[in-house]
From Swiss-Prot:
Covalent S-S links between cysteines: 39-119, 72-77, 125-329, 205-237
Main location class: secreted
Subcellular location: Secreted; Vacuole
Gene: PRXC1B
CDD domains in the record: secretory_peroxidase
EC number(s) from the headed UniProt entry: 1.11.1.7
UniProt xrefs under PROSITE patterns: PEROXIDASE_1, PEROXIDASE_2, PEROXIDASE_4
GO BP field: hydrogen peroxide catabolic process; response to oxidative stress
Protein's UniProt name: Peroxidase C1B
Organism domain of life: Eukaryota
PANTHER family: PEROXIDASE 22-RELATED (PTHR31388:SF270), PEROXIDASE 72-RELATED (PTHR31388)
Record's catalysed reaction(s): 2 a phenolic donor + H2O2 = 2 a phenolic radical donor + 2 H2O
Organism (species): Armoracia rusticana (Horseradish)
Positions of substrate binding: 167
C-alpha cells in the first residue's frame, strides 16, 4: 500500500503538472513547428490519405479546400463545420452555403482516424482540416508551404453564423468585400487570391441559372458573361434541366491548381457572378490590377494565395485551453473533464 505521504506527494506532482500543462497551453500560439515533436509525420499521414482518396474521387482536393474556407469564415478555423446535429446545436452542414454542396466529410474522418492511430489525442480536427487543405492545393499542382498549427476544436456549431457569414455565388463585389472584411480579411489581395481557389473543382447548375437566363430579373443573361461561354453553359445547364448537374469552375484546366482562373476572368468566363465581379464590376478598381497580375504570373498568384491562406487560417483560432482536441471530428468529446484529466496524466508522465 502507498503511505499517506507518498499519496500526497503524487497528488502534488499531478497538481504541479496540471499547472504547468495549462500554463503551457495558455501561452500557445500558432506555429509550423507545433507538432514537430508530438506528431512529426502528421503532414505525410494526411497527404497519403488524400492521394489514396484521389484514386476514386478526383474532386476531393477542391472539396477539402472549400471545407477549410467555409470552416474559417464561421467563428474561425475551429472545425465547427465538421460537427453533426445534436440536441444542443444545429450543424453548419445545413447552412445555405453548405447544404447539398459541402462534401469530403468521410475523407476528413479517415484522415483523422489515421492521425489518431499514429498520435492519439494530439492533433485537433481544425489542424487536420488545415493541413488537408494545404496538401490538397499542392497535390493539385499548387504551392507548398508550412502551415501554422496549434488550433483547438470548437465545442459547438454555428448554423446562424454560417448563414450570415458565408459568401454567396450571387454576391456583388461590395458584398464580397464586406463578407471578407467581417472576418478580418480586409485586403483586396485576400479576396482576389482566395477566390482563386475556384481554379479547380465544380459547381452545380442551380447556382448559375439566373446568370444564364434571368439575371437580376431582366429575363436576359448576365451582360458580363462571354457570349460563347454563355452558349456552352446553357448546353450544360438547360433551362428546364437537372440543376444538380456539375460544371467545371475552370474550363481550361479544371483539375489543376494554377492561375487560369484569372485568365478566364479577363475573358469574361468566370463561372459564378461573385467570381466575375472581381474583374467586371464598376467597383473593381482595386481588384482588376490583381486579376491581371495573377493572370500574367503564376508565382505571383501562388505567393499571394499562401499569404492569404495563412491570414485566413489565423482568424480567431482557439488555442491553449480553449475548446478541445476532438477524438471524432463529428462530435464533441463525450466527457470533456475526463479527456482533460487524460491529457494532464499524459503530460505528467512525460515530465
Amino acid at each position: 500500500m502507498h503511505s499517506p505521504s507518498s499519496t500526497s506527494f503524487t497528488w502534488i506532482l499531478i497538481t504541479l503538472g496540471c499547472l504547468a500543462f495549462y500554463a503551457s497551453l495558455s501561452d500557445a500560439q500558432l506555429t509550423p513547428t507545433f507538432y514537430d515533436t508530438s506528431c512529426p509525420n502528421v503532414s505525410n499521414i494526411v497527404r497519403d490519405i488524400i492521394i489514396n482518396e484521389l484514386r476514386s474521387d478526383p474532386r476531393i482536393t477542391a472539396s477539402i479546400l472549400r471545407l477549410h474556407f467555409h470552416d474559417c469564415f464561421v467563428n474561425g478555423c475551429d472545425a465547427s463545420i465538421l460537427l453533426d446535429n445534436t440536441t444542443s446545436f444545429l450543424t453548419e452542414k445545413d447552412a445555405l452555403g453548405n447544404a447539398n454542396s459541402a462534401r469530403g466529410f468521410p475523407t476528413v474522418d479517415r484522415i483523422k482516424a489515421a492521425v489518431e492511430r499514429a498520435c492519439p489525442r494530439t492533433v485537433s480536427c481544425a489542424d487536420v482540416l488545415t493541413i488537408a487543405a494545404q496538401q490538397s492545393v499542392n497535390l493539385a499542382g499548387g504551392p507548398s508551404w508550412r502551415v501554422p498549427l496549434g488550433r483547438r476544436d470548437s465545442l459547438q456549431a454555428f448554423l446562424d453564423l454560417a448563414n450570415a457569414n458565408l459568401p454567396a455565388p450571387f454576391f456583388t463585389l461590395p458584398q464580397l468585400k464586406d463578407a471578407f472584411a467581417k472576418v478580418g480579411l480586409d485586403r483586396p489581395s485576400d479576396l482576389v487570391a482566395l477566390s482563386g481557389g475556384h481554379t479547380f473543382g465544380k459547381n452545380q447548375c442551380r447556382f448559375i441559372m439566373d446568370r444564364l437566363y434571368n439575371f437580376s430579373n431582366t429575363g436576359l443573361p448576365d451582360p458580363t458573361l462571354n457570349t460563347t461561354y454563355l452558349q456552352t453553359l446553357r448546353q450544360q445547364c438547360p433551362l428546364n434541366g437537372n440543376q444538380s448537374v456539375l460544371v467545371d469552375f475552370d474550363l481550361r484546366t479544371p483539375t489543376v491548381f494554377d492561375n487560369k482562373y484569372y485568365v478566364n476572368l479577363k475573358e469574361q468566363k468566370g463561372l459564378i457572378q461573385s467570381d466575375q465581379e472581381l474583374f467586371s464590376s464598376p467597383n473593381a478598381t482595386d481588384t482588376i490590377p490583381l486579376v491581371r497580375s495573377f493572370a500574367d504570373g503564376t508565382q505571383k498568384f501562388f505567393n499571394a494565395f499562401v499569404e492569404a491562406m495563412n491570414r485566413m487560417g489565423n482568424i480567431t483560432p482557439l488555442t491553449g485551453t480553449q475548446g478541445e482536441i476532438r477524438l471524432n471530428c463529428r462530435v464533441v468529446n463525450s466527457n470533456s473533464l475526463l479527456h482533460d484529466i487524460v491529457e494532464v496524466v499524459d503530460f505528467v508522465s512525460s515530465m
